Amino acid sequence: MKTIYKNGAVYTGKLPLVEAFAVEDGKFVFAGSSAEADALAAAGDKVVDLGGKFVCSGFNDSHMHLLNYGSSLLKAQLAAHTESLEDMLACLDTFQKEHPRKDGAWLMGRGWNQDYFTDVDRMPNRYDLDRVSTEVPICATRACGHCLVVNSKALELLGVTADTPQPEGGEIGMENGEPDGRFFDNAMEPVYDSIPVPSKEEIKDMIRSACKALNSYGVTSSQSDDYCVCRAVPWQTVNEAYKELEDSGELTVRVYEQSNFTDLESFCLLYTSDAADDLIGVD
Protein backbone atom coordinates (compact mmCIF):
# COMPACT_ATOMS: atom_id res chain seq x y z
CA MET A 1 0.00 0.00 0.00
CA LYS A 2 1.29 3.44 -0.97
CA THR A 3 0.86 6.84 0.60
CA ILE A 4 0.43 9.52 -2.05
CA TYR A 5 1.08 13.18 -1.30
CA LYS A 6 -0.22 15.71 -3.81
CA ASN A 7 -0.94 19.42 -4.36
CA GLY A 8 2.36 20.51 -2.83
CA ALA A 9 5.55 22.31 -3.80
CA VAL A 10 8.07 19.48 -3.63
CA TYR A 11 11.82 19.93 -4.00
CA THR A 12 13.48 16.70 -5.16
CA GLY A 13 17.00 18.06 -5.38
CA LYS A 14 16.42 19.37 -8.88
CA LEU A 15 14.32 22.14 -10.39
CA PRO A 16 11.55 22.63 -11.30
CA LEU A 17 9.51 21.74 -8.22
CA VAL A 18 6.99 18.93 -8.58
CA GLU A 19 3.52 18.70 -7.07
CA ALA A 20 3.35 15.17 -5.74
CA PHE A 21 5.24 12.11 -4.58
CA ALA A 22 4.47 8.62 -3.34
CA VAL A 23 6.02 6.50 -0.60
CA GLU A 24 5.85 2.71 -0.35
CA ASP A 25 7.61 0.49 2.20
CA GLY A 26 9.50 3.50 3.51
CA LYS A 27 10.90 4.53 0.15
CA PHE A 28 10.05 7.16 -2.46
CA VAL A 29 8.60 5.42 -5.51
CA PHE A 30 7.29 8.39 -7.50
CA ALA A 31 7.65 12.16 -7.91
CA GLY A 32 5.69 14.17 -10.44
CA SER A 33 2.42 15.99 -11.04
CA SER A 34 -0.77 15.67 -9.02
CA ALA A 35 -2.52 14.33 -12.12
CA GLU A 36 0.10 11.58 -12.43
CA ALA A 37 -0.30 10.82 -8.74
CA ASP A 38 -4.07 10.45 -9.14
CA ALA A 39 -3.49 8.01 -11.99
CA LEU A 40 -1.04 6.07 -9.83
CA ALA A 41 -3.46 5.65 -6.92
CA ALA A 42 -4.86 2.18 -6.35
CA ALA A 43 -7.49 0.79 -4.01
CA GLY A 44 -6.33 0.98 -0.41
CA ASP A 45 -3.74 3.69 -1.00
CA LYS A 46 -3.73 6.65 1.38
CA VAL A 47 -3.89 10.09 -0.24
CA VAL A 48 -2.66 13.22 1.58
CA ASP A 49 -3.49 16.71 0.26
CA LEU A 50 -0.50 18.96 1.03
CA GLY A 51 -2.52 22.12 0.47
CA GLY A 52 0.30 23.88 -1.36
CA LYS A 53 2.87 23.34 1.41
CA PHE A 54 6.58 23.12 0.64
CA VAL A 55 8.23 19.71 1.05
CA CYS A 56 11.92 18.82 0.87
CA SER A 57 14.00 15.86 1.97
CA GLY A 58 15.26 15.67 5.53
CA PHE A 59 18.55 17.33 6.42
CA ASN A 60 21.76 15.39 7.02
CA ASP A 61 24.28 16.21 9.76
CA SER A 62 27.64 15.01 8.47
CA HIS A 63 29.48 15.40 11.80
CA MET A 64 27.15 14.24 14.54
CA HIS A 65 28.06 12.58 17.84
CA LEU A 66 24.51 11.29 18.17
CA LEU A 67 24.83 9.15 21.29
CA ASN A 68 26.93 11.76 23.05
CA TYR A 69 24.39 14.42 22.06
CA GLY A 70 21.56 12.31 23.44
CA SER A 71 23.50 11.80 26.65
CA SER A 72 24.00 15.56 27.02
CA LEU A 73 20.25 16.15 26.64
CA LEU A 74 19.67 14.04 29.76
CA LYS A 75 22.03 16.20 31.83
CA ALA A 76 21.56 19.61 33.40
CA GLN A 77 21.42 22.05 30.48
CA LEU A 78 23.99 24.58 31.62
CA ALA A 79 24.23 26.35 28.27
CA ALA A 80 20.93 28.04 29.08
CA HIS A 81 22.21 29.01 32.54
CA THR A 82 25.69 30.37 32.00
CA GLU A 83 25.16 34.11 32.50
CA SER A 84 26.78 33.79 35.89
CA LEU A 85 28.40 31.24 38.17
CA GLU A 86 25.43 31.57 40.52
CA ASP A 87 23.05 30.83 37.64
CA MET A 88 25.03 27.70 36.76
CA LEU A 89 25.03 26.42 40.35
CA ALA A 90 21.30 27.09 40.70
CA CYS A 91 20.66 25.07 37.54
CA LEU A 92 22.61 22.10 38.91
CA ASP A 93 20.79 22.33 42.23
CA THR A 94 17.37 22.47 40.55
CA PHE A 95 18.23 19.56 38.27
CA GLN A 96 19.36 17.52 41.27
CA LYS A 97 16.04 18.06 43.01
CA GLU A 98 13.88 17.42 39.94
CA HIS A 99 15.73 14.31 38.72
CA PRO A 100 16.30 11.83 41.55
CA ARG A 101 19.19 9.47 40.82
CA LYS A 102 19.82 5.92 41.86
CA ASP A 103 22.57 5.20 44.37
CA GLY A 104 26.03 5.85 43.01
CA ALA A 105 24.83 7.98 40.10
CA TRP A 106 26.63 11.24 39.40
CA LEU A 107 24.99 14.61 38.93
CA MET A 108 25.96 15.60 35.38
CA GLY A 109 25.74 18.88 33.52
CA ARG A 110 27.11 20.37 30.33
CA GLY A 111 27.31 23.73 28.60
CA TRP A 112 28.86 26.27 30.99
CA ASN A 113 31.20 28.92 29.65
CA GLN A 114 33.00 31.21 32.07
CA ASP A 115 33.44 33.79 29.30
CA TYR A 116 29.75 34.64 29.80
CA PHE A 117 29.88 34.88 33.60
CA THR A 118 29.01 38.36 34.83
CA ASP A 119 29.71 37.77 38.52
CA VAL A 120 33.20 36.23 38.46
CA ASP A 121 36.10 36.29 36.01
CA ARG A 122 37.25 32.66 36.29
CA MET A 123 36.28 29.04 35.72
CA PRO A 124 34.21 27.21 38.32
CA ASN A 125 36.12 24.94 40.71
CA ARG A 126 35.50 22.09 43.14
CA TYR A 127 34.53 24.44 45.95
CA ASP A 128 31.83 26.07 43.84
CA LEU A 129 30.27 22.68 43.06
CA ASP A 130 30.54 21.71 46.74
CA ARG A 131 27.88 24.35 47.36
CA VAL A 132 25.49 22.16 45.37
CA SER A 133 26.48 18.92 47.14
CA THR A 134 29.35 17.41 49.06
CA GLU A 135 27.69 13.97 49.14
CA VAL A 136 26.81 13.43 45.46
CA PRO A 137 29.64 13.36 42.91
CA ILE A 138 29.18 16.16 40.37
CA CYS A 139 30.70 16.57 36.92
CA ALA A 140 30.00 19.66 34.81
CA THR A 141 31.52 19.79 31.31
CA ARG A 142 32.33 23.06 29.58
CA ALA A 143 30.50 23.92 26.33
CA CYS A 144 33.61 23.12 24.27
CA GLY A 145 33.87 19.57 25.60
CA HIS A 146 37.59 20.00 26.30
CA CYS A 147 37.30 20.85 29.99
CA LEU A 148 35.22 19.76 32.96
CA VAL A 149 34.98 20.50 36.65
CA VAL A 150 34.08 18.14 39.49
CA ASN A 151 33.32 18.60 43.17
CA SER A 152 35.29 17.31 46.15
CA LYS A 153 33.23 14.10 46.39
CA ALA A 154 34.13 13.23 42.81
CA LEU A 155 37.82 13.96 43.48
CA GLU A 156 37.64 11.64 46.46
CA LEU A 157 36.16 8.84 44.33
CA LEU A 158 38.75 9.46 41.63
CA GLY A 159 41.60 9.32 44.13
CA VAL A 160 43.13 12.47 42.67
CA THR A 161 45.49 14.22 45.07
CA ALA A 162 48.33 16.71 45.01
CA ASP A 163 50.65 13.80 44.18
CA THR A 164 48.72 12.60 41.12
CA PRO A 165 51.01 12.98 38.08
CA GLN A 166 49.92 15.20 35.22
CA PRO A 167 48.78 13.10 32.23
CA GLU A 168 50.26 13.38 28.77
CA GLY A 169 48.05 15.48 26.51
CA GLY A 170 45.99 16.84 29.37
CA GLU A 171 46.09 18.77 32.61
CA ILE A 172 44.70 18.47 36.13
CA GLY A 173 43.92 21.95 37.40
CA MET A 174 45.81 22.95 40.53
CA GLU A 175 45.51 25.80 43.01
CA ASN A 176 47.94 26.31 45.87
CA GLY A 177 49.38 22.87 45.20
CA GLU A 178 46.04 21.04 45.45
CA PRO A 179 43.69 19.79 42.71
CA ASP A 180 40.95 22.38 42.17
CA GLY A 181 38.50 20.09 40.35
CA ARG A 182 39.29 21.16 36.79
CA PHE A 183 40.35 18.60 34.18
CA PHE A 184 41.47 19.35 30.63
CA ASP A 185 41.57 17.17 27.49
CA ASN A 186 43.20 13.75 28.14
CA ALA A 187 42.96 14.29 31.88
CA MET A 188 39.18 14.05 31.49
CA GLU A 189 39.24 10.38 30.45
CA PRO A 190 39.71 8.91 33.97
CA VAL A 191 36.80 11.06 35.14
CA TYR A 192 34.42 9.75 32.48
CA ASP A 193 35.70 6.20 33.07
CA SER A 194 34.74 6.48 36.75
CA ILE A 195 31.13 7.41 36.04
CA PRO A 196 28.80 4.36 36.29
CA VAL A 197 28.39 2.60 32.94
CA PRO A 198 24.97 3.21 31.32
CA SER A 199 22.72 0.21 30.74
CA LYS A 200 21.37 -0.67 27.31
CA GLU A 201 18.02 0.86 28.27
CA GLU A 202 19.74 4.07 29.29
CA ILE A 203 21.60 4.10 25.97
CA LYS A 204 18.26 3.69 24.19
CA ASP A 205 16.92 6.68 26.14
CA MET A 206 19.91 8.72 24.94
CA ILE A 207 19.25 7.75 21.32
CA ARG A 208 15.52 8.51 21.67
CA SER A 209 16.29 11.96 23.07
CA ALA A 210 18.75 12.71 20.28
CA CYS A 211 16.37 11.53 17.55
CA LYS A 212 13.52 13.63 18.91
CA ALA A 213 15.69 16.75 19.05
CA LEU A 214 17.18 16.19 15.60
CA ASN A 215 13.79 15.56 14.02
CA SER A 216 12.55 18.86 15.47
CA TYR A 217 15.17 20.58 13.27
CA GLY A 218 14.32 18.49 10.22
CA VAL A 219 17.39 16.26 10.52
CA THR A 220 16.66 12.69 9.44
CA SER A 221 20.15 11.28 8.82
CA SER A 222 23.60 11.67 10.31
CA GLN A 223 27.16 10.42 10.39
CA SER A 224 28.21 9.50 13.91
CA ASP A 225 30.80 7.64 16.01
CA ASP A 226 28.78 5.98 18.75
CA TYR A 227 30.54 2.64 19.13
CA CYS A 228 33.37 4.10 21.21
CA VAL A 229 31.58 6.91 23.08
CA CYS A 230 31.12 4.84 26.24
CA ARG A 231 34.45 3.02 26.38
CA ALA A 232 33.27 0.55 29.02
CA VAL A 233 30.22 -0.39 26.92
CA PRO A 234 30.84 -2.99 24.18
CA TRP A 235 30.04 -1.73 20.69
CA GLN A 236 27.67 -4.68 20.35
CA THR A 237 25.51 -3.27 23.15
CA VAL A 238 25.30 0.09 21.41
CA ASN A 239 24.39 -1.61 18.15
CA GLU A 240 21.75 -3.75 19.89
CA ALA A 241 20.21 -0.57 21.30
CA TYR A 242 19.99 0.88 17.81
CA LYS A 243 18.57 -2.34 16.37
CA GLU A 244 15.90 -2.63 19.06
CA LEU A 245 14.81 0.96 18.50
CA GLU A 246 14.69 0.30 14.76
CA ASP A 247 12.56 -2.82 15.30
CA SER A 248 10.14 -0.90 17.52
CA GLY A 249 9.85 1.96 15.02
CA GLU A 250 11.55 4.46 17.35
CA LEU A 251 14.72 5.04 15.33
CA THR A 252 13.75 8.10 13.32
CA VAL A 253 17.22 9.13 12.19
CA ARG A 254 19.23 7.13 9.65
CA VAL A 255 22.71 6.68 11.15
CA TYR A 256 26.01 5.93 9.43
CA GLU A 257 28.55 4.87 12.06
CA GLN A 258 32.29 5.45 11.98
CA SER A 259 33.63 2.33 13.69
CA ASN A 260 36.74 4.08 15.05
CA PHE A 261 38.14 0.78 16.35
CA THR A 262 41.76 0.42 17.46
CA ASP A 263 41.92 -3.38 17.16
CA LEU A 264 41.56 -5.57 14.08
CA GLU A 265 39.42 -8.18 15.85
CA SER A 266 36.58 -5.74 16.56
CA PHE A 267 36.83 -4.32 13.05
CA CYS A 268 36.51 -7.77 11.45
CA LEU A 269 33.72 -8.78 13.82
CA LEU A 270 31.72 -5.68 12.93
CA TYR A 271 32.02 -6.23 9.20
CA THR A 272 30.99 -9.89 9.43
CA SER A 273 27.98 -9.10 11.63
CA ASP A 274 24.50 -7.91 10.73
CA ALA A 275 25.21 -4.44 12.15
CA ALA A 276 24.33 -2.62 8.92
CA ASP A 277 20.93 -2.37 7.23
CA ASP A 278 18.69 0.30 5.68
CA LEU A 279 18.74 2.57 8.74
CA ILE A 280 22.15 1.76 10.20
CA GLY A 281 25.35 1.95 8.17
CA VAL A 282 28.93 1.30 9.27
CA ASP A 283 32.34 2.39 8.03
Feature names for model-found ranges:
Residues 2-6, 11-58, 62-269:
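Divalent metal-binding segments
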Residues 271-283:
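Single conserved hydrophobic/aromatic residue that forms the stacking wall/gate
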